[in-house]
Regions:
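Catalytic cores of soluble, metal-dependent hydrolases
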Residues: 2-61, 65-82, 105, 115, ...
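Short, conserved acidic/polar surface loops in the N-terminal third of protein domains
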Residues: 70-74, 93-99
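Long, hydrophobic, well-ordered secondary-structure blocks that form the structural core
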Residues: 83-95, 106
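Glycine- and acidic-residue-enriched helix-capping/strand-helix junction motifs
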Residues: 98-101, 181
Length: 235
């Protein structure tokens, strides 16, 4: 099943999900969530997920400004696991506003607060962001250009989080600065994970600006390719 969190309305301009069982959550009126997530919004989204979604689904989170919703989904995991993230950024920069959850700090928050989370693997992050990350020497955190560079035993399941800003601008334009990974490479990476690990859940964000119809169409096609990888194993 596909669960779409429609914060900006961008999914109303896309078709990739219409061939699959799906739930489209109308979150456009929700305050306190874009970029940063306050406690009220976090509580609302957690209840929405518990009532209408489940962990073992494909979760579409809208633009990268809402990537911290991944952190809310991680609250549902109740067994040891590893987190694999595809992102041009580390998302491990602590918020300038104290403990408030943000799209740039959600992985750091997960690292510090989730006992079941054993290792964090970030694929495709820009080297300048890795150098600025205070976790870049931590043995629980691995930065790499490909999952093939990572020695990760398959004894633990994984949760996968994909921000499409990891994809090259030659493919489409997201709402954040982007990496250099071709879509074809990302697909190969995700298929490798699918074929070698138990997947607990997957989320995808990185939608373009809602007024950018050309890139919304390109993103729609990419979403369909990514969803097709997991649609037979996640429900």
């Amino acid at each position: 099943m596909l669960c779409l969190h429609n914060f900006t309305g961008v999914y109303e301009k896309q078709d990739f999900y219409k061939d699959y069982p799906h739930k489209l959550f109308d979150d456009k009126a929700l305050c306190g969530v874009r970029g940063y997530m306050d406690d009220k919004a976090r509580k609302y989204l957690l209840e929405e997920i518990k009532e209408k979604s489940n962990l073992s689904s494909i979760h579409l989170l809208d633009s990268g400004n809402y990537h911290h919703l991944s952190r809310v989904y991680l609250d549902l995991i109740k067994e040891p696991y590893n987190l694999v993230v595809y992102d041009n950024h580390t998302d491990m920069q602590f918020s300038a506003f104290g403990n408030i959850l943000s799209c740039g700090s959600w992985i750091a928050d997960a690292y510090e607060s989730l006992d079941y989370l054993k290792k964090i693997i970030v694929i495709g992050a820009n080297s300048k962001y890795i150098e600025a990350c205070e976790f870049n020497k931590d043995e629980r955190v691995i930065f790499a250009d490909s999952i093939n560079e990572v020695s990760l035993g398959n004894d633990l399941p994984i949760y996968i989080s994909v921000d499409k800003d990891v994809i090259s601008e030659n493919e489409f334009i997201s709402d954040w600065d982007q990496g250099i990974m071709p879509v074809s490479t990302l697909i190969k990476e995700l298929k490798c994970l699918r074929d070698n690990f138990r997947i607990m859940g997957v989320d995808i964000c990185g939608e373009p600006d809602n007024s950018d119809d050309i890139n919304i169409s390109l993103s729609d096609n990419i979403n369909k390719e990514l969803v097709n990888i997991f649609v037979d194993i996640l429900y």
